[in-house]
Amino acid sequence: MANERRTLLLEFEKPLVELEAQIQQVRDKSSEFGVDVSEQIRELEERAKQLRYEIFSKLTPGQTLQVARHPRRPSTLDYIQAISEEWIELHGDRRGSDDPAIVGGIGRLNDQPVVMLGQQKGRDTKDNVARNFGMASPGGYRKALRLMEHANRFQMPILTFIDTPAAWAGVDAEKFGQGEAIAYNLREMFRFEVPIICTVIGEGGSGGALAIGVGDRLLMFEHAVYSVAPPEACAAILWRDAQKAPQAAEALKITARDLLKLGIIDEIVPEPVGAAHSNPVEAAENLKAALLRNLAEVQALSSSERRELRYQKFRRMGVFTEAV
């Protein structure tokens, strides 16, 4: 467990981990010598709590990207299983493909039938390879579309969970129509009559994120990221140097706070102090509360109102004025 903790340790977390180790040493000494050090432990724990808050409330965009990519960050399946009372996974795009990078199915949210889907990363190297690191193929996006069409046909709200560095950019992806699959999803999501709530739970990268990201509301976890391209790709394109990813992350405005100011997202879902991977249960509770609140608001509108507002929401993005 100690080795795993060191492996997953982010550089900026080191002072916190050292303090936690100090607390454990004091506890061990107390047990060994039978000394009451409860007051000292309380003070150290208070310091650790304050330090954790200070670290995670002042993350740079580059550090936020590291948190969004944390191997122990809750995934789409983690959240679906945590927030739904019942869950049945559905498979396949009905064209011969069942991409494991996209998962989805029917569940109940507060006893309301909903269709939930999203990108799924792996927990270890083997699982990540099997799921292609959450980078979906054209078949994956067609599977997502099939599930969303099912939801629209049977009048069930759609909840999508975005967590991908980008769509798969391999030769086979182009051969099987990656661009067409993404574009088709965008068009159809604007047409659906049912409520659509999209949430960026980790990485929201490029067209791979947007392909399941057209909705009435776009929510985003506090330490998630959302951008037109991964910062490494942006740095390689602009400066021919992927090592300049931190500068690219600053320029891209990838954080939830920046995107809320720009009007790209509608709400920031708060994370536990220490990020979602430190307390997945609390993170899931925050997500469920946000989904239920936004779903109730969107369901109060007629289907024609939803479609018009959804369309106008995305038409407003990127609009700017120039001074003469």
Curated annotation (Swiss-Prot):
Pfam family, one: ACCA
This protein's pathway: Lipid metabolism; malonyl-CoA biosynthesis; malonyl-CoA from acetyl-CoA: step 1/1
Stored SUPFAM superfamilies: ClpP/crotonase
Keywords: ATP-binding, Cytoplasm, Fatty acid biosynthesis, Fatty acid metabolism, Lipid biosynthesis, Lipid metabolism, Nucleotide-binding, Transferase
Locations listed in the record: Cytoplasm
Catalytic class of the enzyme: transferase
Keyword Endoplasmic reticulum assigned: no
Taxonomic superkingdom: Bacteria
Enzyme Commission number(s): 2.1.3.15
A single MF term (Gene Ontology): carboxyl- or carbamoyltransferase activity
Ranges of residues in domain CoA carboxyltransferase C-terminal: 44-297
Cellular-component GO terms for this entry: acetyl-CoA carboxylase complex
GO biological processes: fatty acid biosynthetic process; malonyl-CoA biosynthetic process
Catalysed reaction, written as an equation: N(6)-carboxybiotinyl-L-lysyl-[protein] + acetyl-CoA = N(6)-biotinyl-L-lysyl-[protein] + malonyl-CoA
Subunit structure of this chain's protein: Acetyl-CoA carboxylase is a heterohexamer composed of biotin carboxyl carrier protein (AccB), biotin carboxylase (AccC) and two subunits each of ACCase subunit alpha (AccA) and ACCase subunit beta (AccD).
HAMAP family, per the entry: AcetylCoA_CT_alpha
Family per similarity comment: Belongs to the AccA family.
Entry function: Component of the acetyl coenzyme A carboxylase (ACC) complex. First, biotin carboxylase catalyzes the carboxylation of biotin on its carrier protein (BCCP) and then the CO(2) group is transferred by the carboxyltransferase to acetyl-CoA to form malonyl-CoA.
Name of the protein in question: Acetyl-coenzyme A carboxylase carboxyl transferase subunit alpha
Gene: accA
